[in-house]
Structures are given as C-alpha cells and as structure tokens.
C-alpha cells in the first residue's frame, strides 16, 4: 500500500488537485468527473516558463561544443620589430594620417611615435611595405600640377593675342601718321577738293579710335616710335606673329599629349579655360562687327592704299 501511495503522489503533482479536495466544495460535487480530467502543466508555477525546460532538453541531446580559438606561435628567428604594439600595415582609420610631410621617405600610422630623424633608421623592407600600403599625397599634387598645363597654355595664348592686337594698333597709328605727313608735305601731290575733304575727316575719326584702343601710350612714346620706318615695323610684326603661332602650336601639341596620356585629367578646369577662350573670341568678333572700320589691319591697309594711290609714280619709283 505504501508503494501505491508513493506512485500516486507524482500523479497528484502532475494532474493537480486531489479527488477529496475536489469533492469538498459544492461545485466539485456537482461536476466531479470534469475536475478529474483537468490537466495542470508542471511548469505552471515556475518563474522561467516553458521555454527554459524545452531549451534544456534540446541542449542536453545535441552535441554542442565551443569553437576552437586561434593560437599564435612566435618564431625564434623573428626580429623584435614584429613584436611591437604598433601594426605593420595601416588600417582604414590610418588612411588620413599619412606622414608624407617634412620630406620623409616613410609612411607612419597614428599609433606610431614620432621619432627624431637621426634616430629613425627603418629597414628597407619596412619602408617598401609602408609606402606600398599607404598612398602618397605628394605624387598626386605633382600629377595635378602637370595636368593643369593645358589650362596654363590656353591662358598664355590669350595673353599673346592681346599683346599682338595692341602692337597692331600701335603700328596702324604710326603708319597713319607717317602717311598723312608725307602726303601733305610732298609737292608732287595735286591739291584737290576731294582730297582735302577726305584727309581731315579721316584724321579725327582715327584719333578717336586709337584713343579708345590705346590708353596707356604717352606723347613722348609716340614721338620716339614715329622715328622708325613703317616697313620695318610691319616686317617685325609679321615675324613676331609667325613666332607666336609656332609657340602656340607647340603648346597645343603638349596639351594634346598630356590629355592623351592622362585620361583622368581635371576636365572642369580645361572646360572653363576653353569657355573663356570662346567668350574672348565672341567678344572680339562682336567688336569686329561693330567697329569693323576701327580694326588695326584695316587701318593699315587703308593708309597704305591711300599713300600709294595719292603719290605720283615718279615718287613711288624714287622710294
């Protein structure tokens, strides 16, 4: 009987209340069989709930083992340089901390101490490894400076064109002054009403244009320059123009070679320079359309045409 009572105790714990306790209350007497079939789980009164018992059962049956840890073995022949706290190769956080300043030949990371130059004697292997793993900013600056050469050549060509236009205007003024003085002072020129009417009209109009084009030339400079002959000045300007064109062609060839060899050029700067050149061309074309008669080339040709048309053929032969 004792063994039967002991066997009945787990059933009580598993299924809950005893039959005697169920029949003591009047409600238990009314529904006696229903109370008998009620199941109360074992983990109802435990604070951890049902998940803990399930996980424990699953974990006890599964062969779970911890992961193996990596073990490092120190070689006896290695130097003490490899056992320092600083890493050999810079990490991603050290990319901005590039020590290519002060003309140093090695790259350092943030964790490195900054030694004195006379004390720091790195091995060639360390220098090669650091320089190959970390980019050098100075090389990039030199490349960018080389890539800016086309823009510099374009600015230089625009400055040369401006100087050439100033020289043309000066020569036109000198030739006009020489032609007017020679034609008025010579006795071989027939005095006509049309000539007298045409030359005074041409003088003030030309002075107004030259005063607008050339504003920084004084009267003393004009007197000094007027001593030279017009033919020598024209020849010198032609030779100067040819030399400028050859220099511009060389600059263009250099810029083309640079643009072909360096495909990653700074295209924004080159495009800005080209845009400036286009604006200068448009401005010059607009001025030529508006002031076509004020062009120095037209003035020179007109003065020479009047000079040789007004003079006698005998004077032309003598000249």
Swiss-Prot record:
Entry membrane topology: Peripheral membrane protein
InterPro entries (alphabetical): Mtfr1 (IPR007972)
BP GO terms, sorted: aerobic respiration; mitochondrial fission
Biased composition, class Basic and acidic residues, residue ranges: 9-30
Intrachain S-S bonds: none
One cellular component (GO) term of this entry: mitochondrion
Localization of this protein: Mitochondrion outer membrane
Main location: mitochondrion
Annotated region (Disordered), positions in chain: 1-37
Keywords, sorted A to Z: Membrane, Mitochondrion, Mitochondrion outer membrane
Known function: Mitochondrial protein required for adaptation of miochondrial dynamics to metabolic changes. Regulates mitochondrial morphology at steady state and mediates AMPK-dependent stress-induced mitochondrial fragmentation via the control of OPA1 levels.
Family listed: Belongs to the MTFR1 family.
Protein name: Mitochondrial fission regulator 1-like-A
Species assigned in the record: Xenopus laevis
């Amino acid at each position: 009987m004792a063994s039967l009572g002991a066997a009945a105790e787990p059933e009580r714990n598993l299924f809950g209340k005893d039959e005697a306790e169920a029949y003591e209350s009047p409600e238990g007497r009314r529904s006696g069989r229903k109370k008998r079939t009620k199941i109360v789980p074992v983990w109802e009164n435990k604070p951890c709930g049902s998940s803990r018992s399930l996980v424990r059962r699953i974990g006890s049956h599964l062969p779970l083992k911890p992961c193996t840890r990596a073990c490092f073995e120190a070689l006896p022949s290695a130097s003490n340089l490899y056992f320092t706290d600083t890493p050999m190769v810079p990490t991603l956080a050290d990319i901005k901390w590039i020590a290519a300043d002060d003309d140093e030949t090695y790259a350092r990371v943030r964790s490195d101490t900054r030694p004195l130059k006379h004390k720091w004697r790195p091995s060639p292997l360390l220098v090669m490894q650091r320089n190959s793993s970390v980019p050098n900013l100075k090389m990039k600056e030199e490349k960018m400076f080389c890539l800016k050469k086309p823009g510099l050549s374009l600015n230089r060509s625009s400055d040369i064109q401006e100087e050439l236009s100033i020289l043309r205007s000066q020569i036109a003024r000198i030739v006009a002054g020489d032609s007017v003085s020679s034609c008025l002072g010579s006795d071989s020129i027939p005095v006509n009403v049309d000539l007298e009417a045409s030359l005074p009209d041409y003088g003030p109009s030309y002075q107004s244009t030259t005063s607008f084009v050339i504003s920084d030339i004084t009267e003393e400079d004009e007197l000094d320059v007027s001593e030279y002959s017009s033919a020598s000045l024209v020849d010198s300007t032609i030779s100067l123009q040819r030399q400028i064109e050859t220099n511009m062609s060389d600059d263009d060839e250099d810029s083309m070679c640079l643009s072909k060899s360096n495909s990653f050029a700074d295209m924004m700067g080159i495009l800005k320079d080209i845009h400036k050149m286009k604006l200068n061309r448009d401005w010059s074309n607009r001025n030529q359309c508006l002031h076509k008669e004020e062009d120095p080339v037209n003035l020179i040709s007109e003065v020479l045409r009047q000079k040789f048309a007004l003079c006698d053929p005998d004077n032309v032969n003598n000249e």
